[in-house]
Amino acid sequence: MIQLDPTLLLSWRAGQHPDAPMHNDQRYMTGFGNEFASEAVADTLPVGQNSPQRVAHGLYAEQLSGTAFTAPRGENRRSWLYRMRPAAVHGTFSLIEQSQFHNDFGHGPVPPDQLRWSPLPLPQTPTDFIDGLYTMAGNGSPEAMNGVAVHLYAANASMQDRFFYNADGELLLVPQLGRLRVHTELGMLELEPQQIGVIPRGVRFRVELRDGTARGYVCENFGGLLHLPDLGPIGSNGLANPRDFETPCAAFEQREGRFELVAKFQGHLWRADIGHSPLDVVAWHGNYAPYRYDLRRFNTIGSISFDHPDPSIFTVLTSPSDTHGTANMDFAIFPPRWLVAQHTFRPPWFHRNVASEFMGLVHGVYDAKADGFAPGGASLHNCMSGHGPDAATFDKASQADLSRPDVITETMAFMFETRAVLRPTAQALHAPHRQGDYQQCWAGLRKAFQAPPAS
């Protein structure tokens, strides 16, 4: 049974009676990377220290570190958890043979082809979130602590007596179909399509499906923690604003029984028996915690004169690399917006990129592709692979009346852009839902060049 009572936190702070009614939005604390404090039972958090000799209510104090102890203060991430049992209490791990969810990106040749897939089919047998993960591509490694893995998920069952944590990286969840209720050690995230959630490395959780079936995308970030991009001359506001990020208030389960703890460690899945729910954190404080963000709140920036700016203006979150100005991974979106540029080809232009681009579509239609790119589908354009609008989109935009704005509605596309080449997995290359004729979308782009008469 979930015991979720953030009103106790409010009463502790504001003298409000714990039984006072509250709205759903009070189950979250707002801000990005803030120093939060939350307790599901009043008077649990120690005052003025982290690790008292005896924690209130017979709990244990445990620190969860997401960065090195000596990381600069502005980049340091850690939280103190006050829980019923330490995280060390579980059985011995044994290896799980799992063929779909892994970090095996191969060592052979990577085709330079543009790649596209139809939506991952929904399962026909009971499949929970973990069993429904399907690895598409990746680079780097958990060992080196750089790079990413890109996965899809398709599930039709909730995780009941099963819990998961990822020691290899933080997880960026992008639901496309169906709502998720993610129960974590630090509280509960409710996610729906057009929202995203981030689960930090090491945080234990289970996923409940609210609508029976679910599908979406996952970016597993092995590198530097995701943070907001610098705004430069945009100024102090814009893009994803910090106040719109939400971190859950403390909540806990108090269950004992025969449960399974699944860990992802060094690219493999492991399982251990555990005799209690590990979601037993009664209170916590710190800045290393899950969070969610509603993509519909993104403050889109664009040109109001001419030309189409670089897609970096659509960045929601970025994972830094060791090269200044070059990300390990950028998460960008292409949301509803107005296009008003004059003397300009308004859709995204033709492009070859030193970075590699994995795209997905959460909702609607992507404005650079008239057909073939469906919600739940995906595309991969690796380093220097030419890409851009299909022939139908090019013809339409080339003849458009620019005295009228293009009002793009009913869309939400996104991109994981990575510094290193994304190596597609064997299962992705040979998947029955891969569109083998993807290149044909550019076949209609005919030569129209006419040299002017010689003078």
Swiss-Prot record:
Q: What is its EC number?
A: 1.13.11.5
Q: What's this protein's function?
A: Involved in the catabolism of homogentisate (2,5-dihydroxyphenylacetate or 2,5-OH-PhAc), a central intermediate in the degradation of phenylalanine and tyrosine. Catalyzes the oxidative ring cleavage of the aromatic ring of homogentisate to yield maleylacetoacetate.
Name used for this protein in its record: Homogentisate 1,2-dioxygenase
**Which enzyme class?**
oxidoreductase
Q: GO terms for molecular function, please?
A: homogentisate 1,2-dioxygenase activity; iron ion binding
Keywords in alphabetical order: Dioxygenase, Iron, Metal-binding, Oxidoreductase, Phenylalanine catabolism, Tyrosine catabolism
Cofactor requirement: Fe cation
Q: Please list the residues that make up the active site.
A: 308
| GO BP field | L-phenylalanine catabolic process; tyrosine catabolic process
Which lineage? Bacteria, Pseudomonadati, Pseudomonadota, Gammaproteobacteria, Lysobacterales
CC per GO annotation: cytoplasm
Q: How does it assemble?
A: Hexamer; dimer of trimers.
Q: Which family does it belong to?
A: Belongs to the homogentisate dioxygenase family.
Q: Which chemical reaction does it catalyze? A: homogentisate + O2 = 4-maleylacetoacetate + H(+)
Q: Which residues bind homogentisate?
A: 366, 387
Q: Where does the chain bind Fe cation? A: 351, 357, 387
Q: In which pathway does it act?
A: Amino-acid degradation; L-phenylalanine degradation; acetoacetate and fumarate from L-phenylalanine: step 4/6
Species the sequence originates in: Xanthomonas campestris pv. campestris (strain 8004)
Gene for this protein?
hmgA
Q: Report the InterPro entries cross-referenced here.
A: HgmA_C, HgmA_N, Homogentis_dOase, Homogentis_dOase_bac, RmlC-like_jellyroll, RmlC_Cupin_sf
